[in-house]
Structure formats: structure tokens, C-alpha cells
Amino acid sequence: TEALIGKFTSEFQLGAPSADVLWISSVPVSLRKEGYLAQYHSSEIAAIPKSVLEVFNKPNGYWYPGIMVLYVIGVNTKHVPMAEAPKSWKDLTDPRFKDKIIYADPNFSGDVLRVISTIGTKLHNWDFYKKFAANNPMIVRGHGQVQTFLESGERPIAGEQGHQRLLNSKNKGNPIETVWPEEGIIVSPWSFAISKKAPHPNAARLLI
């Protein structure tokens, strides 16, 4: 997400935009404030429940709900039986899980930033990550790599992963299970937004 936004804003500033529509793992409030987004009121918005619009920070035509990714804990049960698996986010700090956890890099994922912020400020506090770091989690660039290491068993616990990836993997026959953390899951809203300099604005509106 961060790399994509950087490319989008650079092209916008240079006057050579290649994108009509952004599809990102965040709610693009700052992009709206900085003048990058076009406002478009689609009639389809009436079909979206108000409760969903609240989650997406009342977009007012500047972005539209896409999906909501449910972040949970993933376990390779061939290497960590469910009876021994973490039951909560807090359990990820337990020393018995040292050298077993895989985690995506927040420098490349807006979703991971949301997970870290939620755990550090709402579910627990920032001391959580000091204890978590002591467990030597492996940090990889993205969630695709998280899934690869999880499935291979090299790192049998995904410290955060989208539920759909875990479910898809399980349905393919992999020994992957989902842990629904006791403190609650973390939801990341993905949004559509139209560039104010969209090369094909009518096509962008049609997509939205």
C-alpha cells in the first residue's frame, strides 16, 4: 500500500497519472485532504449499510467500501497442534513461541500498521511489542510470504494474517487453522477511490 500510494502521488504531481482508480488497504483520508481524489456520488451507495460506512470513516463520495479483511492468527497444525497454539494476541509474547512466528513488514503494508496500532493502543499497550520482539519473529515483506513460511512449517505461526488466505490454504489441503483471538479480531477496510486526474474518468465512475 505504501509503495502504491507513493507511485500514485508522484505520477499525480508530475502530471502523468497512469491510474484512474486506487484500490488500497486503508481509508485514504490524507489523500482527500491533499487534493488527490475526485468526489463522485454513486447511486449504489444507498445499498451500503450505514454501519459499514461508519467503518469506512464516512467517505462522502471520495472513496467507496471495497472489502473488509479480518486479521487473525494462523497456525500450521502439523508443527503446532491447536491445543498448544496461541489463543490470543497476548499469547504471541509467550516464550514458548520463540522462533516460530512469521509477521509482515509494516513498512510495506497498511494493514500491518493497523494491526500494530490496534494491539499497541487499544487491545494492549506498546510494551506488548517489546515482549513480542523477544520471541524473534521473522519479518517478511508481505502476506504472501507470510503464507509461504506458514505453509512450509518453517515458521508455523502467522502472528497476523487475513482469514481468507488461511481459509483458502486450508481448502487446498494444507494443515492450516485459524485462531480467533480472545481479545477480538482486527478489521482492515479496503477502499476504492477515483483520482482527480484520472485519464479515463467516465470509466472510473462506471467501475465505482
Label every PLM stretch briefly.
Residues 28-31, 156-175:
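A ligand-binding cleft/hinge motif common to bilobed small-molecule-binding domains
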Residues 1-9, 17-154:
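Extracytoplasmic ligand-binding site segments that recognize negatively charged/polar headgroups
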Residues 72-79, 117, 188-203:
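A bilobed periplasmic-binding-protein/Venus flytrap-type ligand-binding module shared by bacterial periplasmic
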Residues 182-187:
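Short, surface-exposed loop/turn microsegments at beta-strand edges and helix-strand junctions
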Residues 39-43, 176-181:
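Short hydrophobic/aromatic-enriched beta-strand-loop microsegments
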Residues 12, 123, 169:
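Active-site catalytic pocket residues across diverse enzymes, especially alpha/beta-hydrolases
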Residues 87-96, 190-208:
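Bilobed periplasmic-binding protein/Venus flytrap-like ligand-binding cleft at the lobe interface
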